[in-house]
A protein has these predicted regions:
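Bacterial N-terminal signal peptides that target proteins for export
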Residues: 1-7
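Substrate-binding cleft of secreted/luminal carbohydrate-active enzymes
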Residues: 233-306, 310
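C-terminal motif of bacterial Sec signal peptides marking the signal peptidase cleavage site
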Residues: 17-18
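Glycan-recognition patch characteristic of GH18 chitinases/ENGases
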Residues: 27-126, 203-209, 215, 300
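Conserved, mostly hydrophobic/aromatic
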Residues: 56, 94, 136, 192, ...
Length: 311
């Protein structure tokens, strides 16, 4: 059913593709279809078209087991992101954690005093950099006490953030493997980024994985308006950016597979991303991208493909 809906929407969108021009001047935050892009300190900001986004997640702010935050290494870059994004009405969130920081979250979330320290540090950071909220990327809470601590942490952070601030989180693609995510979390956050990639060593993010991911989270109780479908701007197994793949062979890079230094790499090309946008328009509320510095430049940008398909 998901596949049928996605393809039908894609065909309808194709008929209108020729009418798509410059980015919509409508304020990004008021557009109903979310386009969430992760940005890292490695990004060259001048080549990213922020007007094609609704939200930017700046990655990463790192936690300590004590509940304190590690020294932030790119303050100038983040301030520049906020300046550029806010000029086009794009929201900016700080993403806290990321892969490999599970032990820190487990420890800090397990005690009320450490949670309070973490919450205050994040709220102060949001205020200092004039951010629009926080994205908590705990990969991943386990079932039982860990899950309960995650709920407590998110509830306390939500209560401490200023009114109108955004609070989001990221989850694994398959909800049946996410026992540590209590559905009560859905009542606390604004939306959830579903990381529908890294599903295998090779063809790691096909359309079928996206369909299965959204269906599984729907079954767990995550509402359509809170589901944001994650897509990769990189290939597996080599973790090669789409930009490098495109520069190596522009014609072949339009597909989903390419030989890169004699080794097959699998990724999402323009056609697959259009199909995923069509799927997200039916079964979710937007697209999330990991990550923007991996995109091709100018007219060959995958962000451009996503933005045009979303119109």
């Amino acid at each position: 059913m998901l596949f049928t809906k996605a393809i039908s929407a894609l065909l309808c969108g194709a008929l209108l593709a020729g009418c798509t021009g410059a980015p919509n001047k409508q304020p990004a935050a008021s557009r109903s279809f979310r386009i969430v892009g992760y940005v890292t300190a490695a990004a060259v900001l001048d080549v990213i078209d922020f007007s094609r986004l609704t939200h930017v997640n700046y990655a990463f702010l790192l936690p300590k087991k004590s509940g304190e935050l590690k020294t932030f290494g790119s303050p100038t870059q983040l301030r520049r992101v906020v300046e550029i994004a806010h000029a086009t009405n794009v929201k900016v969130l700080i993403s806290v954690g990321g892969w490999g920081w599970d032990d820190e979250f487990e420890e800090l979330a397990a005690a009320e005093d450490r949670r309070a320290r973490f919450v205050r540090a994040v709220v102060d950071f949001v205020a200092e950099y004039q951010l629009d909220g926080a994205d908590i990327d705990w990969e991943y809470p386990d079932a039982g006490a860990s899950s309960e601590h995650f709920v407590a942490l998110m509830r306390e952070l939500r209560a401490a953030l200023p009114a109108g601030s955004l609070l989001t989180t990221a989850v694994v693609s398959d909800a049946t493997h996410a026992d540590g995510i209590d559905p009560v979390i859905f009542e606390i956050v604004d939306f959830v980024n579903v990381m529908a990639y890294d599903g295998g060593p090779a063809n790691h993010s096909p359309l079928s994985l996206a369909e299965q991911a959204l269906s599984s989270w729907d079954a767990k109780g995550l509402r359509k308006e809170q589901r944001v479908l994650g897509v990769p701007f990189y290939a597996r197994p080599g973790d090669i950016s789409y930009r490098k793949l495109f520069e190596s062979d522009p014609a072949t890079a339009d597909g989903d597979r390419i030989l890169y230094f004699s080794k097959e790499q699998n990724y999402n090309g323009p056609a697959t991303l259009r199909a995923k946008v069509a799927l997200a328009k039916e079964e979710a509320s937007g697209i999330m991208i990991w990550e923007l510095s991996q995109d091709a430049l100018g007219a060959d940008s995958l962000l451009k493909v996503i933005w045009e398909a979303s119109q």
